[in-house]
Design a protein with these regions (language model features):
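A short, aromatic/hydrophobic, helix- or strand-capping loop or linear motif
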Residues: 42, 57-62, 226-227, 237, ...
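Class I SAM-binding transferase module
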Residues: 2-3, 9, 211, 217-328, ...
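Class I SAM-dependent transferase core
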Residues: 2-144, 153, 385-413
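Short, compositionally biased low-complexity segments
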Residues: 2-3, 18-19, 329-344
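C-terminal target-recognition/interaction regions appended to catalytic cores
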Residues: 336-414
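Basic, glycine-rich polyanion-binding accessory segments appended to enzymes
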Residues: 303-325, 333-334, 346-362, 366
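Conserved nucleotide-cofactor-binding alpha/beta core module
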Residues: 115-234, 240-242
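Short amphipathic alpha-helical segments enriched in hydrophobics
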Residues: 35, 50-54, 212, 365-372
């Protein structure tokens, strides 16, 4: 997992039986071919990281979508009947589910279980690679990883910083201890602590690089306080919709000034513990059966890749969820029992409910266009911990909004 200068015992690189080295090679080659992996140091770290040590067991869903309760199966990478499927999953690059209902990982029993929710997982590896490359981690940097989970991202970061420079904070004490033990088996030179990610980790501050593996509604003041001059912080800014995440890059200049840029993107981290996303699960069958009243429309929503528009919609058309599995664009305001479903390119839209979410999207599109179709926004972070304002610029047509405070969100128990 780490370079030769970190003291890694090469005998640990393939701690699990089977062709893990070949699976790692295939994953790295695919990431390179897709243009995701460009940093040679990170390529070396990925080539050496035995994910099987950090993800020795994994849950897979066995029931059909919509089934309640969900049926899961826990795969054990050391069991001959599970080995092939487990290894394919662990090295697929997909997110790997590793904990159900906060269970101690050491108590997990291979086999089928029913119900419950997943409380820890690894991150989609292309996104992990994208984040780590954007962080520009150098040897010797002090690195803080927040919401670390099983420790995959932390292990890769530690390979870039060198030993004893990377620390992770995980709220679940069972997962923190489990990850620390596995990191030690790898000789990763990283430290895990149990605690509230919103508090950062003051004992090792300041940090040259801070990465948050949880989405937050605004930027916690503790994170700002623990960012060193010249430092970079990367986090997901989350709203109540999972459909359009924001990615915020915070830098502290050499003179100590904080600057923050917010952009939309195709994916982000899940929100902090206790934060509830909107869901349209109970509306989907109704939308399919009775899409609503038809009417003509001249509004053609921009492409999915117009991340600036969709990020603006997440804040300025609040409480709306996109149904990505629909054949055409469908947006739902579940708490208002309202939705809009675009026609199949025929200039029509079907609307339902007291809230005209289609008209709201059209209005925001007009404002976004008038503002210059911005794809990035600027976050003002007052030193006194006051409201954090977002703007697309300084002109009279600039889009702007205020980030919701952390105080309005459920806390994270340590």
């Amino acid at each position: 997992v780490v370079g030769s200068d970190s003291g890694t015992d090469d005998s640990l690189v393939d701690a699990q039986p089977g062709n893990a080295a070949g699976a790692r090679r295939t994953l790295v080659e695919r990431l390179q071919a897709d243009g995701v992996l460009t940093d040679p140091r990170l390529r070396e770290a990925l080539s050496r990281l035995d994910r099987g040590v950090l993800l020795p067991r994994a849950y897979v869903r066995r029931s059909e979508p919509g089934t309640d309760p969900v049926v899961w199966e826990l795969l054990d990478g050391t069991h001959p009947n599970d080995r092939a499927e487990w290894q394919e999953l662990v090295y697929s690059g997909e997110s790997v589910l590793v904990q159900r209902d906060g269970e101690p990982p050491e108590s997990q029993v291979r086999g089928a279980v029913s119900g419950g929710r997943m409380t820890a997982m690894s991150t989609f590896i292309p996104y992990t690679v994208e984040v780590l490359q954007r962080m520009r981690i150098a040897a010797g940097h002090g690195y803080l990883d927040l919401g670390t989970g099983p420790g995959v991202s932390l292990a890769l970061a530690a390979a870039l910083t060198g030993p004893r420079r990377a620390v992770g904070v995980e709220r679940d004490e069972h997962m923190a201890a489990f990850a620390q033990n596995n990191l030690e088996r790898l000789g990763a030179g990283a430290t895990m602590v149990a605690g509230d990610a919103l508090d950062g980790h003051a004992p090792r501050a300041p940090y040259d690089r801070i990465h948050s593996g949880i989405g937050v509604p605004c930027l916690p003041s503790a994170w700002m306080d623990q960012l060193a001059p010249g430092g970079r912080l990367l986090t997901t800014l989350t709203t109540r919709t999972p459909s359009w995440p924001g990615r915020c890059l915070v830098t502290r200049t050499a003179t100590g000034r904080i600057e923050a840029v917010l952009e939309g993107g195709p994916r982000g981290h899940r929100p902090l513990y206790g934060y509830t996303w909107l869901t349209a699960q109970h509306h989907l069958h109704r939308i399919a059966d009775r899409p609503g009243r038809p009417r003509t429309t001249t509004f053609t929503p921009p492409a999915d890749e117009a991340y600036g528009f969709w990020l603006s919609a997440a804040y300025l058309v609040p409480g709306v969820f996109r149904h990505f599995q629909a054949d055409t664009l469908a947006v739902v305001a579940p708490e208002d029992d309202s939705w809009a479903v675009a026609g199949p390119g025929d200039g029509t839209v079907h609307v339902h409910g007291p809230r005209d979410v289609w008209a709201e999207l059209e209005n925001i599109h007009n404002l976004w266009t008038r503002a210059g179709s911005p794809d990035r926004f600027y976050v003002d972070i007052p030193a006194d911990g006051g409201q954090q304002h977002v703007t697309s610029g300084t002109g009279p047509d600039a889009l702007q909004w205020v980030l919701p405070p952390l105080a309005a969100m459920p806390g994270q128990p340590a």
